[in-house]
C-alpha cells in the first residue's frame, strides 16, 4: 500500500514543481499536514493575471525573497497555492489553470471537484 498523500481524484499525489521548488514542505508536491494553516494544496500553473490578483489580495508571489530561497513567480510557473485563496480567485473569475492530478485531496474541503475540473489542464 502506498504511503503517498492523495490527490482530488483519490490517486497518488503527483509532483507539482521542482523549479521553482514548491510545496508546504518544499518537496515539489502539494503535500500538507495539520501545521499547514494556509492549506497550500492547489497545484496551479500561475498566470500573470492570477499573480496580480493574489498580490492585490495580500499574497505577493511575484516579488523575489532570496533570503527565503524564493525566486518570485512568473507566468507559467507551477506552484502550490492556498486552497482558500484559489477558491476566492475562482469566485472572482480570476482562477488560473491547475494540474488536478497534482492537487491534494484536502482541496475538496474548499472547492468542489466540478469547479476544479473546469480549470484542470491534465485531464484526458
Segment roles from a protein language model:
Residues 62-69:
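Short alpha-helix capping/helix-loop boundary micro-motifs
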Amino acid at each position: 500500500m502506498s504511503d503517498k498523500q492523495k490527490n482530488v481524484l483519490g490517486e497518488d499525489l503527483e509532483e507539482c514543481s521542482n523549479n521553482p521548488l514548491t510545496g508546504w514542505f518544499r518537496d515539489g508536491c502539494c503535500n500538507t499536514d495539520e501545521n499547514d494553516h494556509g492549506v497550500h494544496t492547489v497545484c496551479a500553473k500561475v498566470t500573470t493575471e492570477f499573480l496580480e490578483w493574489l498580490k492585490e489580495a495580500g499574497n505577493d508571489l511575484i516579488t523575489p525573497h532570496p533570503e527565503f530561497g524564493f525566486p518570485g513567480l512568473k507566468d507559467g510557473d507551477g506552484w502550490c497555492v492556498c486552497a482558500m485563496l484559489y477558491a476566492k480567485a475562482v469566485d472572482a473569475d480570476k482562477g488560473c489553470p491547475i494540474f488536478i492530478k497534482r492537487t491534494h485531496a484536502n482541496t475538496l474541503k474548499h472547492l468542489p471537484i466540478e469547479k476544479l475540473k473546469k480549470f484542470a489542464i491534465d485531464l484526458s
